């Protein structure tokens, strides 16, 4: 049996001795100020659609869950795994069985902070059983049944068969590899060894739920009508919730780690114009956070009264943004969906668009000074995972992708001419209407769309394409646009759930983003989507990490080389106005860490640019010291 936490704890003790002096001498100016407020105030314009963390995988929804529900483990501010609801864990010698020993002082409370029950291993079993019931339509189900023994067979047995299909055998829950050995010992049995399994447990799919409360609530569990439809075991309680009015998170005094929760109250006020009015409210001291677009950032930096109020945005996560072509359009007839189907199924048409996009120009609304720093040419961001010193995005077929220029005016025009001939023969009409909605609550997205429209129509010609940009709703945008197929081309994003390239196949493999499996002409001899076949082959490799990574690289390269998507980069850059120190937040490229307020403080004096880079240097030095100690 391999014991994990105890060994790492001894190493960390030595590391902290090495960095203690560094911490004392390299604290940024903002960190030297005492926290003068227990309250953190923000505006928001997109309301949550559910509090049911067992079904949602939407960032806007689970940003609340991350703060009110704890996970088995968590990441600290340096990206190191720390115990949370699990005090320790171990792995069997064959890597198939993971055992978690839960703390006995973790409790469930209601929205008033009143004790309900202790958190036990049975709560994790109840959550898995709920997620793996196909009737509950959980977006997290595949995360569990991809790795847990017996989970997929159980899930299939709960599903309603399609017309003409035989139902799958109904399986007993005991065949699934999720087990409460006793009240405080939880065990997962996997299909195959999964080296990154621990990182998976920080995601919503592995959160617990109290089964008694779940059964009492029935279909009302997690309904986003109030704060009394879930229980709480995390750092905060959603003490007030009036949809499209306000949300208030209050420190959970019963939480096992309450001493490390420094912000007592988080006040989030709804305003559909939040992105527009937040900067001025921040300047007046009425709120504590505001996104600053590129135009305003230039003005503030030039003004001595505001120059010290903003700092660069920290790129703390690995959310990847990419333009996706929709192969199953469901938009209004005025945008000619049938004509779009003809066009999008022509590879030369897609490649003309692919090579016509000037990403540097499109990124200027987010990062006006160094736009190239937030851009990359793959779906998986660089530095996400590596092996033997080689970055995954440089491996195999992806290495060829990153070596080639994507914005290429000559190629765009060459593919345009090929597409015109083929599309004319296929019965398409010109210009091809390209419906491209955006979320008005996202700072800079409207400006980006305008830049893209002008730049691409200017290059390819308005006799070839007609890009139509339109503001979508601020609340329920994902449901109204992407999930309904209500777009021709759409800038989508995906954040990793665990530390393996497989996580970046999820939006394409299940077809939820742009339905690549419905593209014509890309099935193999067995009638299976070529992309699906490549992903299946990569997922089947569990004993050779080099071969596994190279196989996933081939699958990802397939999407890019055939222009199913246009890789973009990170979603933000530029500047932020905020009274939090971003280097105090939990850090991990996956899971929920980036959404948590635990460990952070509200400062009277916000970071300026100099403070930010000083803090970043200190943080990177601490990370380097840890890495050196662990080698």
Model-based region annotation:
Residues 243, 402-496, 545, 573, ...:
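Ligand/substrate-recognition segments at binding pockets and active sites
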Residues 159-175, 181-184, 189-267, 275-276, ...:
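Gly/Pro-rich hinge or "lid" segments in bacterial periplasmic/extracellular proteins
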Residues 36-46, 97-101, 124-127, 186-187, ...:
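Short, well-ordered beta-strand elements
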Residues 43-93, 231:
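N-terminal lobe/hinge region of extracytoplasmic solute-binding protein
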Residues 116, 121-126, 183-189, 193, ...:
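Alpha-helical secondary-structure segments
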Residues 352-393, 444-454, 480-631:
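Detector for C-terminal structural segments
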Residues 87-147, 187, 278-284, 339-345, ...:
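Aromatic- and charge-enriched surface segment that lines or borders ligand/interaction sites
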Residues 239-250, 269-334, 360, 364-366:
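Extracellular/periplasmic solute-recognition and catalytic clefts
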